[in-house]
């Protein structure tokens, strides 16, 4: 640094005079406001980027090339995806759920043995690194039933419910404040069978969901041809069988996944074996369903072919459309929802661009559907016409080994 003694006397006098002039002059409003405005504009742009960018987590089966859970960024305005990377190594994380707080992710481990315990899979809790998206393992618990295939976290974030497919049961675990899995809060073993043996010789709980009121849990059991209803106590995390127990579907239909309409008056189940969707009205006070209709997941007049089955079902972001996936047929079916009656009207079937679309995700904007082709190792991004419900190709294809579930989390880039 140059000292004052090194500055010539004439120059020093000029500098002092200039400093006194600036000190006595009133500050320019534009000059003082500009930095604040610039910061405000920067923050606004950052929030805009954050609101349109999500981090996508992909659950997989790890029998082949997959090592666990993968991640990539996704722009919900353009449909473009970022680079795919491994978020966590873990066995067969076939279904995922993001905690309401956004800091943790839970995954089932769809196995038949867990930590030396036979006839049990596992559930894992991960902490999300907000900067990198990587998942850091917190802890794990056994599910007390083989091949857990679905899970849901209640809106308070204090309980996770899991469906065990081969075990034919559902189990609940408490979630502690630090994101770790606590003690088991409930366990229910299903009993019964269905029409088609050996496929339906035993119960097979394929999904569990919580209704919009937060007071009931609904388990679709493929083996029993039944949608079972439980009273859910969010304070204790317990499940109590409702009376009546829940509706039966057509014998041999095989109910798989369930989706409530956000309005809370209707629910829909996709039937894996006979390729149909059954619509129900929902009484959220009594916890009872009444069937409205059953409709095919194939184009009108087309018959079910060998090797075909359904998989995922989701009500669209704004509650106007319902989407379902057909494996073997390798399409996504779209229906229009009558928001007064709950009835479905067929819109179209659209190719997923690959084989075996086990699952798909809808981005928060409602513009895009991400179809996971399990046997093609691809995720195809399809565009949703938000007026008609029809799908269209975007040309965006993401390579992920054995993808079977996606979950999305907003990336906060605002400072």
Language-model-derived ranges and their functions:
Residues 45-75:
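An edge-strand/N-cap motif at the start of beta-rich repeat modules
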Residues 62-65, 110-115, 166-169, 224-226, ...:
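Short glycine/acidic-enriched loop and turn motifs that connect beta-strands
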Residues 65, 90-101, 144-155, 191-215, ...:
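Beta-rich, blade/repeat-based domains predominating
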Residues 72-79, 126-133, 173-183, 230-239, ...:
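Short loop/turn segments immediately following beta-strands, especially the blade-tip
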Residues 82-88, 136-141, 192-198, 242-248, ...:
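A short beta-strand motif characteristic of beta-propeller blades
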Residues 133-207:
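Asp-box/WD-like beta-propeller blade repeats and closely related beta-sheet repeat scaffolds
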Residues 374-415:
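Blade-level signature of beta-propeller repeat domains, shared across WD40, Kelch, NHL, RCC1
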